[in-house]
Amino acid sequence: MVLIKVLANLLVLQLSYAQKSSELVVGGDECNINEHRSLVFLYNNSFGCSGTLINQQWVLSAVHCDMENVRIYLGVHNLTLRNNAEIRLPEERFFCLSNKNYTKWDKDIMLIKLDRPVKTSTYIAPLSLPSSPPRVGSVCRIMGWGAITSPNETFPGVTHCANINILPYSVCRAAYKGLPAQSRTLCGGILEGGIGSCMGDSGGPLICNGEMHGIVAWGDDTCAQPHKPVHYTKVYDYTDWIQSIIAGNTAATCPP
């Protein structure tokens, strides 16, 4: 089991070697350039992750994507052209656990306040938080710059998107030993395999009905295997905490 963060130097070096394949995220296709306006790239010259713009000055990501000297790129499609993007720095970061001692199955969430707001544009727009939890069986969208092949990773350089299903949590418990009976995560994937979030997609969104329902957290060492779904932090369970922090209540606590 691995967190789906990526060594970004490797990603950048491999951009020109990406393969054209119908098995492109793994099992996806290149996103429409206007489809991922909320998606952001977190990068510090060593590691890369994704995040999601949820209003003009706040980004939601995974706490395991926290890194020093990070820059936040908005409006990016092709990573080789990221210097044409809007660039922001984190002004403040907020975690559910002050020591960031998260577990694989709980509280892998980070809220970042940008040093200055961004304007909505053709390529940049915030994504709404969920109004209710997604139902099992819902078809949701994943996206990112992560590997499109696994276990020998190939990175595409441009954003890829795919559809997956919200699966019963029992499917994830059957796939990964030691999970608790309940968790503030969503189990997502395709039971037959072939499609799924992969190395480099960490922190990115799981989008259902136009709302941000999940944050890419962790999955199997080899991506998109049958009966090996990915775990996504369940954003709905943290909406009160998120909204309280944004409103200025920095002492707000996460759900237990």
UniProtKB/Swiss-Prot annotation:
GO terms for biological process: proteolysis. It is found in: Secreted. Glycans are attached at N44, N78, N101, N152. CDD domains: Tryp_SPc. Residues 19-24 form a propeptide. Residues 25-247 form the Peptidase S1 domain. SUPFAM superfamilies: Trypsin-like serine proteases (SSF50494). Residues 1-18 form the signal peptide. One of its GO terms (cellular component) is extracellular region. Disulfide bonds join C31-C161, C49-C65, C96-C254, C140-C208, C172-C187, C198-C223. Its EC number is 3.4.21.-. It is an enzyme of class 3 (hydrolase). GO terms for molecular function: serine-type endopeptidase activity; toxin activity. Monomer. Belongs to the peptidase S1 family. Snake venom subfamily. This is Beta-fibrinogenase-like. It comes from Daboia siamensis (Eastern Russel's viper).
